[in-house]
Amino acid sequence: MAVQLRIYTINRGALNQWATEWREMIKPLREKLGFKILGAWTIEETNQFAWLLSYDGPSSWATLDKAFHQSDERHEMKPDPARNIARIEHYFIDPVE
């Protein structure tokens, strides 16, 4: 199973708004496409939003991620949640045990 850590630096003053929009728009669409959301957190000290998502299905991660970004539902999100993201980091992570 592939697990990805995503860390978004959010524009100042928009962290709570971003978290709400993520919960209402991004999370449901990711889950609909087959991703599993393992958790999400806000980091107020650094104005960041971190979340873990996984996928263990027949398609590749890249195929599913592309489907998310190209979906009509993603293009129809208003307001566009990406407007509040200043920086994106994402890493595939491996368990220690």
Short names for language-model regions:
Residues 40-42:
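Trp/Gly-enriched beta-strand/coil motifs that build multi-repeat beta-propeller-like domains
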Residues 45-46:
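Short strand-connecting beta-turns/loops that link adjacent beta-strands
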